């Protein structure tokens, strides 16, 4: 059975499983991960740290005039969104994720979860999503699997709500248990290779009402999407990727040279090297689409900040952080 995505209608779906009671049970955690493709934890992130992060979102969108200064609800003022930075580039430029993950309570939680020091991958999405202006479309934004676009980077996706997000506000929905099958993306539809409508069974979708302090941790192959905001306020969330430091982590750093055939990088942690590019490399542009091999030197330049994953000297993924 596949979902019929009617305009403006959020399909009925079950609640996410809550994993708080197995947080310190490694065997149970791994079993839930294998079964579901995610963990959902209620109220585990320090709410004061979350509030400090949220205040940076509120200050930014208040400066744009789309909410009233000091409005804790972030109610939309009605101002034109024609120049609104939907990818929140000002926040991305400030890298506000760094002080957040460095907060002692946040660091402790992820160290506890991973049983290792966290290695943060700076693929961060800052979401300050206004109420939908066009309500004639289905509410699912773009169903996708992160792993399709990031081969060779076995990260965990961390989705963090910064305010209460109910069904009207939208938020995250995910497809439970579909992380074990093949990629659902349509290889005949470059450059984004979208997942076809109806590829995810209706009974797989899960969501809940999210609150500050909650976090969803997803397998990189779990299909998921944002949901259009039908409330009167902005939807505030941040998602970021993490790995255990002892894992096969990518190089995060800057390009030192690049041609159509190879790229050299210098990593922030001291790792460096020259790696081969070929047709199988997923070189990702800012829009998420695959950059053709012959266009890579025109889209990436020495000095650019990148994330690079490799296998046996060959680049599997080359992408900007944001």
Language-model-detected regions and their locations in the chain:
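Short, flexible, surface-exposed loop segments at domain boundaries
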Residues: 248-274, 286-322
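Double-stranded beta-helix
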Residues: 165-225
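Short, conserved beta-strand element in jelly-roll/cupin
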Residues: 149-167, 209, 240-244
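Non-heme Fe(II)-dependent double-stranded beta-helix
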Residues: 2-36, 42-144, 149
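Short edge-strand/loop segments of extracellular domains
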Residues: 131, 175-182, 235, 241-246
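Non-heme Fe(II)/2-oxoglutarate
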Residues: 2-19, 63-71, 187-188, 215-217, ...
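Short, basic/aromatic beta-hairpin or loop at an interaction surface
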Residues: 185-196, 273-287
């Amino acid at each position: 059975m596949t979902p019929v995505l009617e305009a403006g209608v959020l399909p009925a779906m079950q609640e996410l499983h809550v994993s708080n009671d197995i947080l310190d049970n490694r065997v149970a955690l791994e079993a839930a991960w294998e079964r579901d493709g995610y963990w959902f934890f209620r109220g585990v992130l320090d709410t004061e740290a979350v509030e400090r992060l949220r205040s940076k979102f509120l200050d930014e969108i208040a400066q744009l005039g789309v909410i009233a200064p000091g409005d804790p609800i972030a109610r939309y003022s009605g101002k034109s969104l024609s120049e609104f930075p939907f990818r929140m580039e000002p926040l991305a430029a400030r890298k506000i994720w760094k002080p957040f993950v460095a907060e002692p309570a946040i660091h402790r939680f992820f160290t506890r979860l991973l049983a290792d020091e966290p290695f943060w991958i700076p693929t961060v999405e800052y979401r300050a999503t206004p109420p939908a202006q066009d309500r004639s479309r289905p509410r699912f934004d773009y169903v996708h699997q992160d792993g399709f676009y990031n081969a060779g980077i076995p990260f965990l996706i961390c989705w963090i709500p910064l305010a209460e997000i109910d069904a009207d506000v939208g938020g995250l929905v995910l497809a439970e248990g579909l992380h074990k099958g093949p990629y659902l993306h349509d290889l005949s539809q470059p450059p984004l290779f979208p997942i076809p409508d109806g590829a995810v069974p209706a009974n797989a979708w899960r969501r809940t009402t999210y609150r500050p302090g909650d976090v969803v941790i997803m397998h990189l192959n779990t299909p998921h999407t944002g949901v259009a905001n039908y409330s009167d306020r902005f939807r505030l969330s941040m998602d970021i990727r993490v790995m255990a430091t002892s894992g096969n982590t990518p190089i995060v750093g800057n390009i030192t040279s690049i041609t159509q055939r190879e790229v050299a990088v210098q990593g922030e942690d001291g790792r460096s090297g020259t790696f081969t590019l070929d047709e199988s490399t997923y070189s990702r542009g800012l829009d998420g689409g695959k950059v053709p091999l012959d266009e890579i030197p025109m889209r990436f330049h020495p000095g650019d900040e990148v994330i690079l994953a490799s296998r046996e000297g060959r680049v599997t993924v080359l992408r900007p952080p944001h």
